[in-house]
């Protein structure tokens, strides 16, 4: 349930054709009460927690001509640990910005460096909002960008060969073929697996890329759940007889951050899913 100091925002969506309605809600946390936002040069609101490099945007929601502080982090965050793992892919509790600069409210600017950006009026508080800057996101623009999501379905030596291929497409394709052992399977694997990865980037981008998050990883391996149950403090994804619980763990960088409750019981089915994916059986 909600605590006394929490509020929720509710949206009701009605499809008149089929005469059905859905209710969606989000918990508004006082410690993350930020009214600022990004807007494109064309005046469109940026609803996603990411933008692409060299895309002109402006910060709004502050006082006119008020300067705000932007902290830039170029950390490479780890991919999620498997659902059966006892150890988490932990991130340092305190990450240090690579650089800090200021922008005025409404000032149009383009971010040229990929990474994580945190917007704050006062760096001594725990208020602000963050977004990622990527290239060609949520798609995978370069061959080397494709390597990361393989970490969930590859042995270490296979992953190393993919990484060493650089942007050499011929070597990359050869490494993928060594995993799937069939040209048609390789083609289907790339199409379906990276379609899932793109969706994960779009839906689950946090302080790190969507495919690296716990929910993104689960989506990559299991696909879309048959049902999602949302509670104030957690989400439960149902796949028939298998359920995954994600505990809400809000941070300054991502108020909507969720952490998978891991358990050894998932190991056997997880390996079965990975084996099916490697054989392009989705």
Question: Language-model features: where?
Answer:
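Aromatic sugar-binding surface patches on proteins
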Residues: 1, 89-111
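Extracellular ectodomain segments of secreted/surface proteins
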Residues: 23-86
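Short, aromatic- and glycine-rich surface loops/edge beta-strands on solvent-exposed regions
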Residues: 3-17, 112-125
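Conserved, structured regulatory domains from eukaryotic proteins
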Residues: 258-264
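Second-shell loop/turn segments in exported
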Residues: 146-150, 158-164, 199-208
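A cross-family detector of function-defining hotspots
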Residues: 169, 178-211, 217-258, 269, ...
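Short beta-strand elements
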Residues: 15-45, 125-152
């Amino acid at each position: 349930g909600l605590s006394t100091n929490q509020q929720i925002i509710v949206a009701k969506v009605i499809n008149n054709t089929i005469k059905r309605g859905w209710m969606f809600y989000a918990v508004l946390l006082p410690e993350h009460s930020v009214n600022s936002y990004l807007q494109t040069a064309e005046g469109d609101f940026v609803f996603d927690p990411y933008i692409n490099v060299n895309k002109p945007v402006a910060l709004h929601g502050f006082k006119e001509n008020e300067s705000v502080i932007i902290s830039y982090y170029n950390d490479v965050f780890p991919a999620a640990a498997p659902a059966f793992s006892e150890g988490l892919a932990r991130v340092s509790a305190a990450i240090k910005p690579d650089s800090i600069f200021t922008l005025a409210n409404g000032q149009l600017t383009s971010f040229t460096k990929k990474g994580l950006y945190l917007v704050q009026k006062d760096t001594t508080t725990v208020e602000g909002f963050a977004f990622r800057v990527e290239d060609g996101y949520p798609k995978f623009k370069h061959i080397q960008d494709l390597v990361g999501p393989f970490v969930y379905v590859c042995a270490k030596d296979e992953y190393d060969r993919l990484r060493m291929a650089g942007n050499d497409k011929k070597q990359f394709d050869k490494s993928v073929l060594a995993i799937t052992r069939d040209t048609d399977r390789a083609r289907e694997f790339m199409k379906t697996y990276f379609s899932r990865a793109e969706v994960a980037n779009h839906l689950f981008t946090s302080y790190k890329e969507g495919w690296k998050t716990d929910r993104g990883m689960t989506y990559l391996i299991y696909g879309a759940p048959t049902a999602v149950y949302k509670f104030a403090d957690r989400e439960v994804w149902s796949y028939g007889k298998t359920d995954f619980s994600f505990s809400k763990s809000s941070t300054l960088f991502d108020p909507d951050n969720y952490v998978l409750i891991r358990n050894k019981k998932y190991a056997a089915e997880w390996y079965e899913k990975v084996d099916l994916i490697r054989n392009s059986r989705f």
